[in-house]
Amino acid sequence: MAKMQAKVQADERDDGLREKMISVNRVTKVVKGGRILGFAALTVVGDGDGRVGMGKGKAKEVPVAVQKAMEQARRNMFKVPLKNGTLQHEVHGKHGASTVLLAPAKDGTGVIAGGPMRAVFDVMGVQNVVAKSHGSTNPYNLVRATLDGLRKQSTPADIAAKRGKSVEEILG
């Protein structure tokens, strides 16, 4: 199975969503009569204000696979609570053999993250974050682990509601 890593491409459509293609892989299905070639695309979509979604698409042609992935990413979008262009608190995410550590950063730090994680933060609109990946560097697993970590975030209001206290008491 030949592997073809694509450059991360950005695109902004008329609906205001940011789209990034993370990878396109050439895949092969072996049948009795020979090989059937196809393509698998991995994309992320975000609104630049905390909403993000991931999609994957498979087809015989690259543009069709990318289009399917973009449509799936738009359907799978969810909201991430941000605080001044960064994360609320440090969080760990895991998927498969990939583990990621996501930490908030001060203004001026920028996005310190590798490959697929950087694409997720770019489409989300995060300006300052530090991210470190451990284990598998498979782009699909890294994106899923990053999204897992982002889903685990909680706001001070969420924590206050769980503890039965006011937000002022939590923030101290």
From Swiss-Prot:
GO terms for molecular function: rRNA binding; structural constituent of ribosome. It comes from the Bacteria. GO terms for biological process: translation. PROSITE patterns: RIBOSOMAL_S5 (PS00585), S5_DSRBD (PS50881). One of its GO terms (cellular component) is small ribosomal subunit. It holds the Pfam family Ribosomal_S5_C. The keyword tRNA-binding does not apply. Keywords: Ribonucleoprotein, Ribosomal protein, RNA-binding, rRNA-binding. Residues 17-80 form the S5 DRBM domain. With S4 and S12 plays an important role in translational accuracy. Located at the back of the 30S subunit body where it stabilizes the conformation of the head with respect to the body. The N-terminal domain interacts with the head of the 30S subunit; the C-terminal domain interacts with the body and contacts protein S4. The interaction surface between S4 and S5 is involved in control of translational fidelity. Belongs to the universal ribosomal protein uS5 family. Part of the 30S ribosomal subunit. Contacts proteins S4 and S8. HAMAP family: Ribosomal_uS5_B. This is Small ribosomal subunit protein uS5. The lineage of its organism: Bacteria, Pseudomonadati, Pseudomonadota, Betaproteobacteria, Burkholderiales.
